[in-house]
């Protein structure tokens, strides 16, 4: 199955996105945003979790996802890895729904394109994982 390799590629997309945001966060700068809401989102109180920028947490999420996808490339039949990937991407997908639809749209009234890229990547990871798990009949 190509699914583990797709997961690997998607994890790299997420890594690139969060690395870019983390770089700007580290320099205390706001990246240029085509849709105009990045400054509102990235400077809000909700952009940090106990003082840690969410871009850093996203970076860790995608590093771990990359490692998990790599292990799935090596051991594609591992039930534990497939279930772990399903749980991990499911949690990521749920959080991204909360972050985009509740926090950004309802609370802040603004959208960040980089957050949207991360959310779409996370949903694609979850969808690919569901397909992978179902096609391998746990």
Outline where the language-model segments fall.
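Membrane-interfacial helix-loop segments of redox and metal-homeostasis proteins
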Residues: 1-138
């Amino acid at each position: 199955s190509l699914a583990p390799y797709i997961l690997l590629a998607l994890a790299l997309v997420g890594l690139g996105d969060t690395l870019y945001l983390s770089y700007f966060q580290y320099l205390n700068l706001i990246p240029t945003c085509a849709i105009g809401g990045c400054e509102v989102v990235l400077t809000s109180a909700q952009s940090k979790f106990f003082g840690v920028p969410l871009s850093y947490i996203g970076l860790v999420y995608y590093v771990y996802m990359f490692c998990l996808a790599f292990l799935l490339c090596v051991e594609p039949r591992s039930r534990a890895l497939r279930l772990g990937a399903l749980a991990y991407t499911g949690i990521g997908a749920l959080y991204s729904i909360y972050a985009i639809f509740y926090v950004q749209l309802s609370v802040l009234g603004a959208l960040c394109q980089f957050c949207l890229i991360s959310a779409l990547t996370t949903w694609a990871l979850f969808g690919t994982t569901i397909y992978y798990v179902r096609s391998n009949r746990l």
